[in-house]
């Protein structure tokens, strides 16, 4: 049955309630105390339509943006060190920078492209001869080598994740560091010692790959890794060395504090009109609402909360209570049926949300339905469109991952965010959207929330995506899935599995009849992987005696590899070994995506060793009983995480929620250990994704016994399988970001 995408009957599915807040309190007087502003308070960027007042420091760093997912983090790292930075498009010439004046150095970002592509972006070669110090990162490093006479080669084995490299500490960039450093590598193209540009020397190595080159006389430095992210342990020190020892900056850049900048922007955009803000109850939308109230007063801000049918257990009730602290009336609407029945056009015609199994289409339907529902609510509240702006708590990572022009005209799309869909972008073009946090990262928003006086319960709340549980349910039809792989490790279409990972590291027997190693023999692949490991991991791999089983799951998840989006398979590891060999399992999780380019996520399956391959999936769509199943599992897992319930043996569980930054709970259409005589798959599995990060651009999967108590996770496994009907297995996501994103979709 065809269903109209404009079916938004407010009487069909909506329950409108208004939380009448107490009389608004007088906001404290706004003050700007530059003497007490910390380093992270400095704030400058060249983003379209962002009127931020700048105070010139007399020294600036130019960042040439090649579309790196971490491009904005580079800008942030420089600002944290009190040096002014400005972002420019990749085609900016050296002459332009010289004529603008005031630039003391240049940083070239990474990017999603390969230097081998026919139309791969390049830069003005005079960037390297203009006399300014240059730091090239990832793709910028490869261009530095190529444009100075070296070459770059395409590798069979990717490097994606935290790796140990050896560095020359006599080089200015690495002064004060250890000879072995942990860094984030994410690339498939490489430079070897034989292909380094003339007059450049190797200053860092990762196995047999070159991880850094330099010409100190010309003050040119290039690194294959990403020093701007948290996974590079001493990346800030590297930026400090470049800015102060190489470039000669003083670090005297100060500007208005964040709060004042945001308030100034809100007032300049809104003028004497009003704002409608959609509030989810998360920290981003709460801080956005608090800023709007501070800038405009409560009478010019209308806050609404939309229950789209995919909230967590009793989430909307909790939102109403927590947002009362903002002294804003909250208008609550329930639109579950409307969202489920909303449709969008795709290549196969029109698809409804509750019949959709494509993750990108799900996000687009939800994002666009939010905008259409907003119009219905404005009519219900007698709001004049011409008198109101739409406000969103959009963050910088949202825009970067959606490849929005606000963040970078060249960033590769990782996933479409519900607050950055086509309709939202159209409203931006009309100047009708206010996004005061669009230049902020999550940790910066928390700091701003504290400055605004928001309660700890809101400021430290774990993030929850706007589309809700809809993107934590991986949907599937009952059509038999086909495993599809590309690359030198595979020969055409592969319907198979990894059978064993045993005594030798990754010495697995993958169905030889499929001819997987026609282009690359296993032993060569294994040796290449071992070369990329640290000495500790190599010893662990070669000495282990555990029996571990590995199975490819016929489902795809979103990831980021080489600064670009990946949509690849997950691998499930299992073992009979007790205690569970976590160190070894996490070593596998790091290496498997390097060996198998078609894999971007690795999970551990609690319980016994998996015996059978997964040959079909459970029919799964966004219908009420499926959503309820995930709501129950999520509620159980979070109660255990925050110590709200006792363990199965009656002992009190500790509150360990503060030890991680987020824990998505995901439902998979996968039925493990199914009776082979059963006609079809009917159960689901649950994934726990505890995640440790400071900026959500990169991060580490929480390790049992290190970040979280093992007994907490084991208790989650027991409680979910006991109390939620139709659950086959509970899995632990062991994947860092990259190669896996925080969310699975």
From Swiss-Prot:
Binding site for substrate: 363, 563, 662, 737, 743
Keywords, alphabetical: ATP-binding, Glutamine amidotransferase, GMP biosynthesis, Ligase, Nucleotide-binding, Purine biosynthesis
Active site: 138, 226, 228
GO biological process: GMP biosynthetic process
Disulfide bonds: none
PROSITE patterns given in the database record: GATASE_TYPE_1 (PS51273), GMPS_ATP_PPASE (PS51553)
GO molecular function, one term: ATP binding
UniProt entry tagged with the keyword Nucleotide-binding: yes
Domain GMPS ATP-PPase, first and last residues per copy: 253-461
Domain Glutamine amidotransferase type-1, chain residue ranges per copy: 60-252
Region (Disordered): 1-37
Catalysed reaction equations from the record: XMP + L-glutamine + ATP + H2O = GMP + L-glutamate + AMP + diphosphate + 2 H(+)
EC number assigned by the record: 6.3.5.2
Pathway the protein contributes to: Purine metabolism; GMP biosynthesis; GMP from XMP (L-Gln route): step 1/1
Broad enzyme group: ligase
InterPro entries in the record: Class_I_gatase-like, GATASE, GMP_synth_C, GMP_synth_GATase, GMPS_ATP_PPase_dom, NAD/GMP_synthase, Rossmann-like_a/b/a_fold
Recorded GO CC terms: cytosol
Self-association state and partner proteins as the record states: Homodimer.
Name the record gives this protein: Probable GMP synthase [glutamine-hydrolyzing]
Organism: Caenorhabditis elegans
Gene: gmps-1
């Amino acid at each position: 049955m065809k269903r109209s995408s404009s079916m938004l009957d407010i009487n069909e599915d909506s329950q409108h309630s208004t939380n009448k807040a107490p009389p608004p309190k007088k906001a404290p007087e706004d003050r700007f105390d530059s003497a007490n502003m910390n380093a992270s308070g400095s704030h400058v960027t060249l983003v379209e339509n962002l009127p931020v007042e700048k105070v010139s420091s007399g020294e600036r760093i130019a960042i040439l943006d090649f579309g790196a997912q971490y491009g904005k983090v580079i800008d942030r790292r420089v600002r944290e060190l009190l040096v002014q930075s400005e972002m420019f498009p990749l085609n900016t010439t050296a002459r332009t920078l010289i004529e603008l004046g005031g630039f003391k150095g240049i940083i070239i970002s990474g990017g999603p492209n390969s230097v081998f592509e026919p139309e791969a972006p390049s830069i003005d070669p005079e960037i390297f001869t203009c006399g300014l110090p240059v730091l090239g990162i990832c793709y910028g490093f490869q261009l530095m080598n190529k444009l100075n006479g070296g070459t770059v080669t395409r590798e069979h084995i990717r490097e994606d994740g935290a790796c140990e490299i050896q560095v020359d500490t006599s080089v200015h960039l690495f002064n004060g560091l250890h000879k072995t450093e942990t860094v984030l590598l994410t690339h498939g193209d490489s430079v070897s010692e034989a292909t380094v540009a003339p007059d450049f020397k190797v200053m860092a190595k990762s196995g047999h790959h070159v991880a850094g080159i330099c010409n100190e006389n010309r003050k040119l430095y290039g690194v294959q890794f990403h020093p701007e992210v948290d996974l590079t342990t001493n990346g800030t020190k590297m930026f400090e060395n470049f800015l102060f020892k190489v470039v000669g900056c003083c670090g005297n850049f100060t500007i208005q504090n964040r709060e004042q900048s945001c308030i100034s922007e809100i007032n300049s955009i809104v003028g004497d009109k009003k704002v409608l803000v959609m509030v989810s109850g998360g920290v981003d939308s709460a801080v956005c609402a608090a800023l709007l109230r501070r800038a405009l007063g409560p009478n010019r801000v209308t806050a609404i909360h939309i229950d789209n049918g995919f909230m967590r257990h009793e989430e909307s009730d909790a939102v109403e209570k927590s947002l009362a602290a903002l002294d804003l009336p909250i208008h609550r609407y329930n639109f579950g049926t409307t969202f489920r029945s909303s449709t969008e056009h795709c290549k196969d015609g029109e698809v409804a949300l509750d019949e959709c199994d494509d993750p990108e289409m799900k996000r687009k339907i939800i994002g666009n339905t939010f905008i259409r529902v907003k119009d219905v609510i404005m009519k219900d509240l007698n709001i004049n469109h011409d008198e109101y702006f739409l406000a969103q708590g959009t963050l910088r990572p949202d825009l970067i991952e959606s490849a929005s022009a606000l963040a970078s005209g060249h960033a590769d799309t990782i996933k479409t965010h519900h607050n950055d869909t086509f309709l939202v972008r159209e409203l931006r073009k009309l100047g009708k959207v206010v996004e005061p946090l669009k230049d902020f990262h999550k940790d910066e928003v928390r700091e701003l929330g504290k400055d605004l006086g928001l309660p700890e319960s809101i400021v430290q709340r774990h993030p929850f995506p706007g589309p809700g549980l809809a993107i934590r349910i991986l949907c599937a039809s009952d059509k038999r899935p086909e495993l599809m792989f590309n690359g030198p490790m595979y020969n055409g279409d592969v319907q198979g599995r990894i059978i064993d990972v045993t005594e030798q590291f990754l010495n697995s027997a993958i169905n030889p009849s499929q001819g997987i190693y026609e282009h690359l023999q296993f032993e060569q692949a294994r040796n290449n992987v071992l070369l990329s490991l640290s000495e500790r991991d190599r010893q662990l791999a070669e000495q282990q005696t555990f029996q571990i089983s590995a199975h490819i799951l016929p489902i795809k998840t979103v990831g980021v590899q080489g600064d670009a989006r990946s949509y690849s398979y997950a691998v499930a590891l299992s073992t009979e070994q007790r205690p569970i060999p976590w160190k070894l399992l996490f070593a596998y999780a790091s290496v498997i995506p390097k060996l198998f380019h078609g894999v971007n996520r690795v999970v551990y399956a609690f319980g016994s060793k998996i015996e059978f391959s997964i040959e079909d999936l459970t029919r799964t769509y966004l219908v009420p009983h499926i959503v309820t199943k995930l709501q129950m599992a999520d509620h159980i897992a979070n109660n255990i995480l925050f110590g709200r319930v006792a363990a199965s043996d009656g002992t009190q569980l500790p509150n360990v929620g503060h030890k991680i930054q987020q824990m998505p709970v995901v439902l998979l259409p996968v039925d493990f250990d199914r009776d082979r005589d059963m006609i079809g798959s009917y159960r689901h599995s649950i994934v726990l994704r505890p995640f440790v990060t400071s900026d959500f651009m990169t991060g580490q999967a929480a390790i049992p016994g290190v970040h979280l108590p093992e007994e907490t996770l084991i208790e989650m496994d027991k409680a979910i399988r006991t109390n939620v009907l139709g659950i086959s297995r509970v899995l632990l996501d062991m994947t860092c970001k990259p190669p896996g994103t925080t969310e699975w979709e």
